[in-house]
Amino acid sequence: LDISYRELRERNRKLMKILTKGKEIKITTKKGTDLVMNIKGRKCFDDNGIYNKKGSFGNLPSGEVAVAPVEGTTNGVYVVDASFGGFGKLKNPLKIKVKNGYAIEIKGYKAKSIEKHLKNKKYRNIAEFGIGTNPKAKVNGCVLEDEKVIGTAHIALGNNISLGGKVSVPLHLDGVIKKPTVWVDEKKIMDKGKLVV
């Protein structure tokens, strides 16, 4: 909580500008993440911690920008190696294979337990892509803070209504990824966890 919200707002503003104009996101990691998603026309969410207008909202600690990928467009694999919603800090990575916007295969740490929560196909929807922007947040197993850590990205399954998506289900599970490389329309915005914009 003890951060410069002015600096956070500026960091978020730069990312928001790129994501709002963007059409496609690609994310990779050394651990095997290689995922592509369409975000054309999607509004971005700016969690900058400044809630001074009527109707504004967010959560604390703040520090992320996020977008709901267009349903049915995400393909590839992502490897969660920090934490996963409802399961906390991961002892070993979790590998999630995605086809046409849905998680079709989950392997690794706690995979069987996670699968039990994903019986409904819509729960497997790729609901969110986000980038952490808080320099003082630390990975501790509480996904609400973990997803804000600068140098991470997160991908969520399930509900995306609050982000302007179309899938309404009673589930939203974030998977936090350390040190990703991220491109928006072939412009690199993060290199192995370091913001380069």
Sequence positions of predicted segments:
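Short, solvent-exposed amphipathic alpha-helical segments in soluble enzyme
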Residues: 42-44, 94-97, 145-146, 171-172
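Short, catalytically relevant binding-site loops at active-site mouths
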Residues: 44, 84-87, 110-112, 135-137
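Structural motif
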Residues: 24-26, 75-77, 95, 104, ...
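Active-site bordering "gate/hinge" segments
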Residues: 1-87, 91, 95, 183-192, ...
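A beta-strand-loop signature enriched in Asp, Gly, Thr, and Trp
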Residues: 100-135
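Composition- and surface-driven signal marking solvent-exposed, interaction-prone regions
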Residues: 90-93, 108-119, 143-144, 168-170
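Cysteine/selenocysteine-centered motifs that mediate thiol-based redox chemistry or coordinate metal-sulfur cofactors
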Residues: 123-180
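Active-site proximal loops enriched in glycine and acidic residues that flank catalytic Cys/His/Asp
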Residues: 80-82, 98-100, 107-110, 133, ...
